[in-house]
Each structure stands twice: as structure tokens, then as C-alpha cells.
């Protein structure tokens, strides 16, 4: 009984303390794409003209489009699920990881809010959905992971990325 009271007390403190939080792991995320875009307002005002990395949105910097998978443990074996696309990009002098991350996130926010036009087959924006964009450094350059939780949206992201950069190499098989 004592243990139950301790757990219920801890749970009530955690839930009451996070009533105003925008994210709590035990509750579903109810934010809309517009809500998420507005969360970036302060960050994106500094780069309103997109001058930090003007070539970041060019299809020519994308060397390959690789389908991004996640391993989900289910039962004995597990399962691979499509999450989106990994866009491998050429390194350029004016495009470090942080600048590229902010440029792509602000582009998604601006298009979502109607402040910027959507590029043809834009892999960084999907109407009605918010894409998780994470830029990292690799041995060969930069990689922008454009991810979503919906399998249908993930498939659309891969298709749009391939059409956006048709000269880029397409890799669909999961990597070990």
C-alpha cells in the first residue's frame, strides 16, 4: 500500500507540474503544424530573408536520397518501418550543420504559415503534417533526415525528395 501511495503521489506531481507543457511523453501531441511553425517564430525572424544558407534549398546540393527506416521491436523479431528520407548533401563552405538546420526548419515554418512559396516537390514540407528535420554531419558531408511518424507521409516524403533532386542517387533498401 505504501508503494502505491508513493507512486500515485509522484505521478500526480509529475502530471500537475506539466499541465502547461507543450510536450509530455505519456500524452499524445495535439499540436498542429501551424502551432509548431509558430514555435519557431523567434528563431526564424533572424533569418527572415533566408540569407544564411541560400543554396540549402537547391536540389543540386543533394547527392543521394536514402529511405530512412526505424526498427520497431514487436514480438520475437521486430519490424522495419519507413520514417522518411535521409538527404545526403555536398558540404559547402557557407553551410555548417547549425545554419542548414535552421534554414530548413525556418523554410518549413514559413511555407506552413504561408509566408514563403513551396518549392516544386518540396521534400521539406508536407501539407497537413509537420516533418521532423534533423541535420547532422557525416564522413562525406551533411545529412538532413526528414522524418514523420505516418507511413503514408513517409512514403510521400521519399517520393517528393526523389522528384525534387532527380539527379541524386536513390537508395531504398535499409542499411544494416
Residue ranges of each PLM-predicted region?
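Sec-dependent bacterial lipoprotein signal peptides
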Residues: 1-18
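Bacterial Sec signal peptide processing site at the extreme N-terminus
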Residues: 15-36
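Terminal, regulation- and interaction-focused segments at domain boundaries
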Residues: 35-37, 74-97, 145
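Compositionally biased P/S/T/G-rich terminal and signal peptide-adjacent segments
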Residues: 41-81
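C-terminal partner/receptor-binding element of secreted or periplasmic proteins
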Residues: 43, 149-176
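Mature extracytoplasmic domains of secretory-pathway proteins
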Residues: 88-122
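Surface-exposed, polar/charged faces of alpha-helical domains
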Residues: 91-95, 113, 138-141, 145, ...
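Short, solvent-exposed interaction modules
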Residues: 117-149
Amino acid at each position: 500500500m505504501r508503494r502505491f501511495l508513493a507512486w500515485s503521489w509522484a505521478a500526480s506531481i509529475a502530471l500537475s507540474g506539466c499541465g502547461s507543457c507543450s510536450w509530455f511523453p505519456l500524452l499524445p501531441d495535439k499540436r498542429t503544424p501551424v502551432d509548431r511553425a509558430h514555435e519557431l517564430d523567434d528563431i526564424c525572424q533572424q533569418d527572415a530573408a533566408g540569407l544564411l544558407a541560400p543554396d540549402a534549398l537547391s536540389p543540386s546540393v543533394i547527392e543521394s536520397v536514402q529511405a530512412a527506416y526505424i526498427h520497431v521491436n514487436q514480438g520475437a523479431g521486430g519490424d522495419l518501418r519507413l520514417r522518411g528520407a535521409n538527404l545526403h548533401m555536398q558540404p559547402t563552405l557557407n553551410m555548417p550543420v547549425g545554419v542548414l538546420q535552421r534554414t530548413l526548419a525556418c523554410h518549413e515554418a514559413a511555407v506552413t504559415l504561408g509566408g514563403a512559396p513551396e518549392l516544386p516537390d518540396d521534400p521539406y514540407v508536407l501539407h497537413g503534417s509537420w516533418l521532423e528535420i534533423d541535420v547532422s554531419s557525416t564522413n562525406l558531408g551533411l545529412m538532413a533526415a526528414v522524418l514523420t511518424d505516418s507511413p503514408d507521409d513517409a512514403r510521400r516524403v521519399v517520393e517528393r525528395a526523389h522528384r525534387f533532386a532527380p539527379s541524386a542517387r536513390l537508395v531504398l533498401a535499409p542499411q544494416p
